[in-house]
A protein has these predicted regions:
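Non-catalytic alpha/beta scaffold blocks inside enzyme catalytic domains
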Residues: 1-16, 23-29, 36-255
């Protein structure tokens, strides 16, 4: 796991994990091996969904074929999706759709705000930022990050507790804190590094006004007017999408 490998004795830790599994007879058998859960809760699952800037879920990339594949899975019209993306003029003078271009990674979002837009491969600077389960003190360039936060039009922090994201800047407006539930206040699957799934049940109800991530996401989609498209294949009970249907949908698209 990330806690073991990033330790000062990471190599020795990893060798010890493997030696322990060998001693217990858990190597070379079904369900065996040192297939751990990466880092904090469900890092592998998030990676498989590719909530990053360079790929669609399942590591399909951003090609037209990848978009058409996921359009079929979602039951969405590919041309409608394509029309939602702006385009830029490349160095060769040809128009390029942002749909097929890599976005700004989380480590460089600061530049998306502060950089001269003439130097960027997108029509405008980043004007809004959502920190969802992410504290910026895990990155460098905090002085520039503070300046970027203060330049944003809007900043949203979604976490069980207020993080550095909520207090780093000196801005007094345009910051919204949304309390998210912890892993014990919801249910669903988490994925190990060998892609095996572990299903977890809810232990307690969400505390106070906090909500699970998938409920917050549905509320956003409904507010922005595309919930009917986003949850076309997913049953929604009130404001809570059915996790089992979410699981069926991503399994349908990620056979690899």
């Amino acid at each position: 796991c990330m806690g073991g490998t990033q330790h000062t004795n990471g190599n020795n830790n990893t060798r010890a994990y493997c030696a322990l599994q060998l001693a217990l007879g858990n190597m070379g058998v079904a369900g065996g091996g040192a297939n751990i859960f990466r880092g904090h809760d469900n890092v592998q699952g998030a990676t498989d969904f590719c909530v990053l800037s360079h790929s669609l879920p399942g590591y399909y990339g951003l090609s037209a074929g990848a978009w058409k594949h996921w359009s079929r899975v979602w039951g969405e019209d590919y041309d409608w999706l394509k029309a939602r993306f702006d385009s830029i003029t490349g160095k060769d003078g040809k128009a390029k759709s942002l749909m097929n271009l890599k976005g700004i990674p989380v480590s460089r979002w600061i530049d998306g705000v502060l950089e001269d837009k003439d130097n960027m491969d997108q029509p405008d600077n980043v004007r809004g930022m959502v920190f969802w389960g992410h504290a910026p003190n895990s990155q460098t360039r905090l002085k520039e990050m503070k300046a970027a936060m203060e330049k944003l039009d809007i900043m949203v922090v979604i976490d069980p507790f207020p993080t550095v994201s909520a207090v780093l800047s000196d801005r007094t407006d345009g910051v919204y804190l949304l309390p998210a539930s912890t892993q014990y206040e919801t249910y669903g699957s988490v994925t190990a590094s060998n892609r095996s799934l572990q299903w977890r049940e809810k232990v307690i109800e969400p505390s106070f006004d906090s909500l699970p991530d998938h409920v917050i996401m549905h509320k956003f989609a409904k507010k922005f007017g595309f919930a009917d498209r986003m949850f076309r294949n997913i049953k929604v009970n009130g404001d809570e999408p059915l996790i089992e249907d979410v699981t069926r949908e991503f399994n349908k698209g990620m056979w690899t």
